[in-house]
Amino acid sequence: MAQHESATRRTPAQLRASVVGVLASLVRWAGLVVVLILVIRVLLTIGGANPANGITSFFRSWSDPLAWGFKDLFTPSDAKLRVLVNYGIAALFWLIVSSVLTRIIRRIG
């Protein structure tokens, strides 16, 4: 029995590697969820989805805070182009940030 317990015990380095791996994965997935929300907002807007629809308003309400200062970075007269450019840049920003943070976490760990 004692041999079995010592064989399944993890070293501190193994435990740290597991925690770092999970944390890096969480950061990466969170970034991808944010990007997905922003991209869906762009697709719904470009596609001319009904703004009063529940799905459209859900993604609008979630994407506005995630776009930060990007939502009015460029102000073309066409509303669809404005959403495409500004929310597209915000999606790229979050994709890059989550990727960089994931690499930093893995490198530190």
Predicted regions and their residues:
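N-terminal intrinsically disordered, cationic/polar leader segments
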Residues: 2, 6-18, 24
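Alpha-helical membrane-inserting segments
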Residues: 39-43, 70-71, 97, 101, ...
